[in-house]
């Protein structure tokens, strides 16, 4: 996993060089760098002793930090304490990372960067093994449905068929995406022994 992460970081370096040589391509190159970073994060988290234990909370923080740095936009991630961690199924780790990347990046591009305000929160659902990840920015959703394009099409293609749902809501003056994860995509970790 460490070698894969290093190789992906090398690719990101080459893309940054290309970005400096072709400033007119800045936005699409940054988008690709962000996607590669999200995959790299997975391999970094899997490079630990327990390779199959990628935690949703750690992945969310790492993806948000990467986008925050790349797009120079503050992203506030709120995870309550105490928090019982859940791990992502190994087969879903890369798709979940890319979905989180696309949703947070879209929030940055569609108002979060202009307002310097992107809020990401993890909360327990009604059942113990359900987790809600919300991404909120100032503004209103358009009245008419938006046809899928770009990042939205990628999200639709990568969303797990079972164990993940995406819902758009309006919370006063904030446009909110609620991503709910359930088994088989996530599994609660056992609480540490006393």
PLM-predicted stretches and their roles:
Residues 1-9, 13, 17, 102:
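Conserved phosphoacceptor histidine of two-component systems
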Residues 15-27:
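Short acidic helix/loop segment immediately C-terminal to the autophosphorylated histidine
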Residues 30-41, 45, 52-69, 73:
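Short beta-to-alpha transition helix within the HATPase_c
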Residues 117-129:
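Short beta-strand/loop element within the Bergerat-fold HATPase_c
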Residues 131-140:
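Conserved DxG motif in ATP/Mg2+-binding regions
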Residues 143-170:
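ATP phosphate-binding glycine-rich loop and adjacent ATP-lid/helix-beta elements
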Residues 181-194:
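C-terminal end segment of the histidine kinase catalytic
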